[in-house]
Amino acid sequence: MADLETSDLSRVLPSSNLLSLEQLQEQLKRHRDELFQQQQDSHVLGSKPDDSLNNNYLLSHQYHDSQVYIPSNTWSFTQGLIVGQLSVVFVIVIFIKFFVFAESSPALAKSSITKDASVVIVKRDKKDQSSSDDADPDDDSETTASNAKVAAILEKTYYDVDNHSPESLDWFNVLVAQTIAQLRSEALLSDNIYHSLNNFLLKSELPEYLDKINLTEIDIGDDFPIFSNCRIKHSKDGSGRLEAKIDVDLSDTLTLGIETKLLLNHPRPLTAVLPVQLSVSMVRFSGCLTVSLINTADPEFAELSAHNSPEPGEPMSRSHSAGSPGGDSSHDEVISTPDSSSHTAQRKHSKDDPNDGTALMFSFSPDYRLEFTVKSLIGARAKLQDVPKISSLIENRLRAWFIERCIEPRFQVVRLPSLWPRRKNTREQVTNKNGDKVEDGSN
């Protein structure tokens, strides 16, 4: 086409102008090639970003498709889910086993059992009874008779130990509240609690580094314990005895405050004096109370009385036991510590002992809750308040005192008075001149 145009132009135009036309054609051709090359270059450069975007889009879709449809990735997610669920279940089981159903603290050492025997502490001693050479041959028959008596009582009272629902003790709570309220009124009017505690502190032998102790605060509270969820069960010791298990809850503030002085007597007497003020409050108690009636002549109970504890200043090894040369011969039963290594020395109760009779036995389960608040103030000018170490020591000491006396397998025994009607216990309401009824105090 270009050649035709050139020939035509050569025919029409004169020869003088032919050279310039050929140059013009070459220039046009060169410009056309340059434009074509520029268009190709611009087309290549403009298509690269779009291609990269398309490639990224395709790669992302391929990645998502691979995660959705590849079986190996799906099975890994399932494995992780199963392992996670199993680990959660394992942690829950470990927590329940070691924190919820954890065993109670081990029993206290033998030496701490006989530190304070002002209150009678008794403990079941079945090993002594089973291993004693002087055992009564009629024990089996007595046990059978006791079980038959218990079965007859349950049958005649229409009480099923296994299926009977727990009972509320609202009426008992009212009676206990009235009794406690009366005791509080008498204590406030006569100050007998203050005088009794003060006399006890004055008569107590104190170490040389401690000055006399003065009472600064006594709070007997204003709330009452709540008893609930009572159920009758057979005793776990196999004796067949019936016992009542009652839930107890007390939220009150019982406070005792004292003040004293720590004396530094070295190198000379009264070198330094450090005032100390302490206030201990019990703010919460809850637990399961076990109550049963026992016969104090039953040989399965071993009594730990006051004469089994050492005298002040006397070592523990010199404590007297029943039947020993230094013991009290007026007792007719064996005196044995709960952790005694010898289980063969046991003395039978005397059947003619006037102290034998019915007693109320009570104890608390080891899963009790006891909370204290201890406040301390040490020093005269520069005072230290609420020292954590002092609070911890006092709280641990109070808990140990309570465990040694009332936590199973130890329990307390309270002798019940005779319920037989007696003339000296007879009373009658009489009317005075004003028409008011008053209680006759004469026998």
Swiss-Prot record:
Residues 131-142 have a biased composition (Acidic residues). One of its GO terms (biological process) is protein insertion into mitochondrial outer membrane. PROSITE patterns: SMP. Residues 102-443 are cytoplasmic. GO terms for cellular component: endoplasmic reticulum membrane; ERMES complex. GO terms for molecular function: lipid binding. It is a single-pass type I membrane protein. Residues 1-80 are lumenal. Keywords: Endoplasmic reticulum, Lipid transport, Lipid-binding, Membrane, Transmembrane, Transmembrane helix, Transport. Its main location: endoplasmic reticulum. The chain crosses the membrane at residues 81-101. CDD domains: SMP_Mmm1. It is found in: Endoplasmic reticulum membrane. The SMP-LTD domain is a barrel-like domain that can bind various types of glycerophospholipids in its interior and mediate their transfer between two adjacent bilayers. Belongs to the MMM1 family. This is Maintenance of mitochondrial morphology protein 1.
